[in-house]
Amino acid sequence: MKIYLVGGAVRDALLGLPVKDRDWVVVGSTPQEMLDAGYQQVGRDFPVFLHPQTHEEYALARTERKSGSGYTGFTCYAAPDVTLEDDLKRRDLTINALAQDDNGEIIDPYNGLGDLQNRLLRHVSPAFGEDPLRVLRVARFAARYAHLGFRIADETLALMREMTHAGELEHLTPERVWKETESALTTRNPQVFFQVLRDCGALRVLFPEIDALFGVPAPARWHPEIDTGIHTLMTLSMAAMLSPQVDVRFATLCHDLGKGLTPPELWPRHHGHGPAGVKLVEQLCQRLRVPSEIRDLARLVAEFHDLIHTFPMLNPKTIVKLFDSIDAWRKPQRVEQLALTSEADVRGRTGFESADYPQGRWLREAWEVAQSVPTKAVVEAGFKGVGIREELTRRRIAAVASWKEQRCPKPD
């Protein structure tokens, strides 16, 4: 029996990145030997065991053979005669097909070290094309390591295109697509994930609402980048700088979906694109089974981001109604989330990357003023039932009006 550290732990250690999870491969052993040594079996489809002390995963070396469609259509073979090289060959990328023995020596049968040095994401073997999930995984790795200068090898991107055009991605379940997307949204450069999907044709298959934005023009006065798809990726990049939250980043990604519905004869203007985009947000989220909290914020951002841009022109009643509409009294974090997504929208434009966004500050200030109006005072004044809410709203509007008169600049 020989045990090797494999995959991401080896890769990230070589890149000087923190190692979170450690996975191990066991060569020359059987399930019974692992059980006799005190390991606990957890794998249903192939032999994976938990170490009795560390609870890290130890998998018997195995090979995989395509036996059906999609990313689940594989038959696994695990036996003492499966070599380490056999096991590493089934992995997706050469940088993930590295192993380390107990002496610290790196085993690299597929030039993963060279690709690490050259910052290349390259597939290990043609078997890559048998698993459609790998298209998403490579896009996610490209986003995760973009800040280190990694790029996808030409032949790997070509294979990803072939897989997409062959209809392989249609076998992916919504849950797996969302899981990879959610993980990509946590990276430093989530926009790279969607750019890679577009480069290989997968964006049109998995995210047609986003793909439809490319080639749709916006007024050059407001959008020097002109193309709405490019603007969308720029805003996502900016959102990633402003917030680590997946819901903020996803909402930013979806903020302009309605522009994809504008008839070409009306281009480059997109009146009413916010409310129009709400239906597309719902459609996308229902298809991918996006969690409701993330979906709800995306709907609100699509509907209200343009309103926040015009904040100085809003009357106090409209401002308080906005807080009602986003359910800020019960979910106050939405005010900050809406401020951040709107700021990302403004700064996600060519030449505006460092622009100030005072509307975000005014939105936050108005919220502090509105929520500082005490409910207790209304009740103590003798208001009852629905009258409490009406009086509370009246006082909030009055407080915001007073603040706006003093602190918010008059519209030109």
From Swiss-Prot:
Residues 228-329 form the HD domain. The keyword Ribonucleoprotein does not apply. The keyword Magnesium applies. SUPFAM superfamilies: Nucleotidyltransferase, Poly A polymerase C-terminal region-like. Pfam families: HD, PolyA_pol, PolyA_pol_RNAbd. Magnesium is required for nucleotidyltransferase activity. It catalyses: a tRNA precursor + 2 CTP + ATP = a tRNA with a 3' CCA end + 3 diphosphate; a tRNA with a 3' CCA end + 2 CTP + ATP = a tRNA with a 3' CCACCA end + 3 diphosphate. One of its GO terms (molecular function) is tRNA binding. Catalyzes the addition and repair of the essential 3'-terminal CCA sequence in tRNAs without using a nucleic acid template. Adds these three nucleotides in the order of C, C, and A to the tRNA nucleotide-73, using CTP and ATP as substrates and producing inorganic pyrophosphate. tRNA 3'-terminal CCA addition is required both for tRNA processing and repair. Also involved in tRNA surveillance by mediating tandem CCA addition to generate a CCACCA at the 3' terminus of unstable tRNAs. While stable tRNAs receive only 3'-terminal CCA, unstable tRNAs are marked with CCACCA and rapidly degraded. Comprises two domains: an N-terminal domain containing the nucleotidyltransferase activity and a C-terminal HD domain associated with both phosphodiesterase and phosphatase activities. This is Multifunctional CCA protein. The gene is cca.
